[in-house]
Amino acid sequence: IGDLWARFSAVAAANPNAWVRESLTAEQICEVGPDNRMISWPYPKLMNSNNMVDQSAAVVLCSAEKAEYLQIPRDQWVFPHAGTDSHDTYSIAERDELHRSPAIRIGGARVLELAGIGLDDIDHVDVYSCFPSAVQVAARELGLALGDADRPLTVTGGLTFAGGPWNNYVMHSIATMAHRLRENP
């Protein structure tokens, strides 16, 4: 788990908008101490979402016609090709298997189908990362490798290191992804 989170930390270290821009080792992340107290076994503070941040993000959506009218350069345009919405039961006690997420599996398969692409067509990924287990479950359900150095599971550095401003983390993910896609479509 520490190695997984160290990879997230390394991405955050290169993210100019991340809250924690120091690349931490697996040992630093896992070792419990005064600055990294145990929150809930097996996760110390550095494996939990960091919501004590002062951040914001925004995305402006408009038609291509409006973008042309506003003279937004075409190389700044990013098009969403598909989207889905799914959720597992909110009550953890009602879930059949805590290590699975039918919603992620079904929603992920459907969005790829709607976009007409496969996982191998995707270079950039950002998996919701409130805790390592959320990343492990999502990666498993989507068929993503946990240790793929060529395709990290985050573009921001995740909620621990990039910052998790309560309900706005995904907006940070989308905004960062838009920048990444402009650089490398």
How would you describe each model-predicted region?
Residues I1-V53, A57-V59, A64-K66, I72-F161, ...:
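Conserved "HGTGT" condensation-loop signature of ketosynthase/thiolase-family condensing enzymes
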Residues F161-N167:
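Glycine-rich phosphate/pyrophosphate-binding beta-alpha loops
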